[in-house]
């Protein structure tokens, strides 16, 4: 007898580089698993955040060696990190669009390779321009491909513990800074700046296996096929939603003041009379308060005691007020002083700023639906980058005009307070705050992705995406 012919089903494998979850042998969950492999994704996002933002913050240790080798000013070498940060933030929507089209896993893996090549290319630089191209453009674009897709994938794995998971991932920045800063100094002392950049390229390549851990997850309401139009993949249609537009405007204003302490907190402490070690302590306690608050606020937000939009407005306002206090602290002593008042103000600022950070990304699924989280994350990072590029230079200009950083921190705090005031309008922009209306589809078909009450979104997540409309 002739052997029976096998019938091959069409669509057994995706056009992507990896099988889609529909083809997996195990059944898919009806909603986010809220744990399980999601914690592996959280650990991967933690490492991705550390190997991008944490490494970027530590690069400044190599700038004195670069300035001496190329006989350039400190301002010229500072443009390396400024360019890398600008490219990383501004190109984040590109990473989101590619992730929406091809999946987060291959995009993050490619981003890790590009970032690593940027360091390797820079290790052979014969001019500072080569460092601008290698670290600023190539590595910066590689980092742009990793952060938003990783954070968006993480948000899809969690519902009740989403903000806690996001807060855990965001602590990778501070944790890696504590480890990479002394490690980079050791590499510079041992191998010089060229050898250090080569080894940093090898370390950065670990972004690729981290990306391999971002397994795709199909949720109810996901569109049957990814968008083919570049504009649709960028998610610009999200700005047609009133709630997201309000959130975007507030976040852009907050970005104008949020990054100023990253650049000018230590110089401000020196202006207030502290020595180098005292200024370093001020920065350190602010960073530790920031990291701890991200976890605590993530847990608090997931308890559901206070709606996320209200928490976002409250902690945003506290961050702005904290910067006011930091700016108004008087002269605290000489170089031997530890600066008690400024130290206390820095702790208060760090706690409030750290509490704000996970809420920015944790509130997105409630505004755009789980299906639009990756696109929304890229757009939010781009908006914050616009404010981040304007805030520190304006702060430095005010310092030059007034002689200290008081006006700079007052303006930064005012920008954050303005953005937080705009956040107050978020609950009224959500559908459930208007007249009650029946859901478009029966509740069993939507999946319990977020705590009730919920509303069905038709795009970008498709029918069945959920919206946290708690006011």
Swiss-Prot record:
InterPro entries: MFS, MFS_dom, MFS_trans_sf, Proton-linked_MCT. Changing residue 443 to T: Risk factor for T2D. Residues 19-28 have a biased composition (Low complexity). Keywords: Cell membrane, Diabetes mellitus, Endoplasmic reticulum, Lipid metabolism, Membrane, Symport, Transmembrane, Transmembrane helix, Transport. GO terms for biological process: lipid metabolic process. This is Monocarboxylate transporter 11. Interacts with isoform 2 of BSG. It comes from the Eukaryota. It comes from Homo sapiens. Residues 1-35, 428-471 are cytoplasmic. Expressed in liver, salivary gland and thyroid. It is a multi-pass membrane protein.
């Amino acid at each position: 007898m002739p052997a029976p012919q096998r019938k091959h089903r069409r669509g057994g494998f995706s056009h992507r580089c990896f099988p889609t979850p529909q083809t997996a042998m195990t059944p898919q969950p009806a909603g986010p698993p809220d744990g399980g492999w999601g914690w592996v994704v959280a650990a991967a996002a933690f490492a991705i955040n550390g190997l991008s933002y944490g490494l970027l913050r530590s690069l400044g240790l190599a700038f004195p060696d670069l300035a001496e080798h190329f006989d350039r000013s400190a301002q010229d070498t500072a443009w390396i990190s400024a360019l890398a940060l600008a490219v990383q933030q501004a190109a984040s929507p590109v990473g989101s669009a590619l992730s929406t089209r091809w999946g987060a896993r291959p995009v993050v893996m490619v981003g890790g390779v590009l970032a690593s090549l940027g360091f390797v290319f820079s290790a052979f630089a014969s001019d500072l321009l080569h460092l601008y191209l290698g670290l600023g453009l190539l590595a910066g674009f590689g980092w742009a491909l990793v952060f938003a897709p990783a954070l968006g994938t993480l948000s899809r794995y969690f519902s009740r513990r989403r903000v806690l998971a996001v807060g855990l991932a965001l602590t990778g920045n501070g944790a890696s800074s504590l480890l990479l800063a002394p490690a980079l100094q050791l590499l510079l002392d041992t191998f010089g700046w060229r050898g250090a950049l080569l080894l940093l390229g090898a370390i950065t390549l670990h972004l690729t296996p981290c990306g391999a851990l971002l397994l795709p997850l199909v949720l109810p309401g996901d569109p049957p096929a990814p968008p083919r139009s570049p504009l649709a993949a960028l998610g610009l249609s999200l700005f047609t939603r009133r709630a997201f537009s309000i959130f975007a405007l507030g976040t852009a204003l907050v970005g104008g003041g949020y990054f100023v302490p990253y650049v000018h907190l230590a110089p401000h402490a020196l202006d207030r009379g502290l020595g180098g070690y005292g200024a370093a302590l001020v920065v350190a306690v602010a960073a530790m308060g920031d990291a701890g608050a991200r976890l605590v606020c993530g847990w608090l937000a997931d308890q559901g005691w206070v709606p996320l939009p209200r928490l976002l407005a409250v902690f945003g306002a506290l961050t702005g007020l904290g910067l006011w206090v930091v700016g108004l602290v008087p002269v605290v002593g000489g170089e031997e002083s530890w600066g008690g008042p400024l130290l206390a103000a820095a702790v208060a600022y760090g706690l409030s700023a750290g509490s704000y950070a996970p809420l920015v990304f944790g509130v997105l699924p409630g505004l755009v639906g789980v299906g639009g989280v990756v696109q929304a994350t890229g757009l939010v990072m781009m908006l914050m980058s616009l404010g981040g590029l304007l805030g520190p230079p304006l702060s430095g200009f005010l310092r030059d005009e007034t002689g200290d950083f008081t006006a700079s921190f007052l303006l930064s705090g005012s920008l954050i307070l303005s953005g937080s005031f705009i956040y107050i309008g978020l609950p009224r922009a959500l559908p459930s705050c208007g007249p009650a209306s029946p859901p478009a589809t029966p509740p069993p078909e939507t999946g319990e992705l977020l705590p009730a009450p919920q509303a069905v979104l038709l795009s970008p997540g498709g029918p069945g995406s959920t919206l946290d409309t708690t006011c």
